[in-house]
């Protein structure tokens, strides 16, 4: 899975898990990413849309595209924006309430 970025954020959008693949594909070492808001990797021009969708998902709203593969622009440590292909998944508690989100991304 070193060629896949796995990023997990809590319900506030704070990065809780950053895989070795995320470090390789996006450029930030784990210790620089953990504890940061996902704004770290969301290009500025997409942040408003991102936070609208993330907030809706954390309130229990639908996620589009649920489990489907899609292209996602990601801001790398170098400052470049790279398009990665992947999926988003909402993480839920035993009571089924949203507690965070996981992205699994790879180079197309």
Question: What are these model-derived regions, one by one?
Answer:
Residues 12-14, 24:
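PAS/PAS-like sensory domains across diverse signaling proteins
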Residues 21-33:
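PAS/PAS-like sensory domain cap-loop motif
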Residues 32-48:
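PAS-family sensory/regulatory domains
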């Amino acid at each position: 899975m070193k060629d896949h970025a796995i990023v997990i954020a809590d319900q506030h959008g704070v990065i809780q898990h950053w895989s070795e693949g995320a470090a390789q594909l996006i450029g930030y070492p784990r210790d620089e990413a953990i504890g940061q808001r996902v704004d770290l990797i969301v290009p500025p021009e997409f942040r408003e849309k991102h936070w609208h969708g993330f907030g809706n998902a954390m309130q229990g709203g639908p996620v589009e595209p649920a489990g489907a593969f899609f292209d996602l622009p990601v801001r790398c440590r170098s400052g470049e924006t790279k398009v990665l292909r992947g999926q988003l998944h909402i993480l839920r508690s035993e009571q089924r309430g949203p507690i965070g989100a996981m992205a699994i991304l790879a180079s197309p």
